[in-house]
Structure formats: structure tokens, C-alpha cells
Amino acid sequence: IGGIISFFKRLF
């Protein structure tokens, strides 16, 4: 899963 990556992509 890559939920954390998507979360960071939304922040930046």
C-alpha cells in the first residue's frame, strides 16, 4: 500500500 506517499503528495 502507498497511503502515506499519497498523503505526502497531497501536502506538497
Swiss-Prot record:
The keyword Nucleotide-binding is assigned to this record: no
GO cellular component: extracellular region
Main localization of the protein described in the UniProt heading: secreted
Keyword Secreted part of the UniProt annotation: yes
UniProt subcellular location: Secreted
Tissue: Expressed by the skin glands.
GO biological process: defense response to bacterium; killing of cells of another organism
Key words of the record: Antibiotic, Antimicrobial, Cytolysis, Secreted
Cited function: Has lytic activity, but has no substantial hemolytic activity. Has antibacterial activity with a broad spectrum against various species of bacteria including both Gram-positive and Gram-negative groups.
Family under the similarity heading: Belongs to the grammistin family. Group 2 subfamily.
Name assigned to this protein: Grammistin Gs B
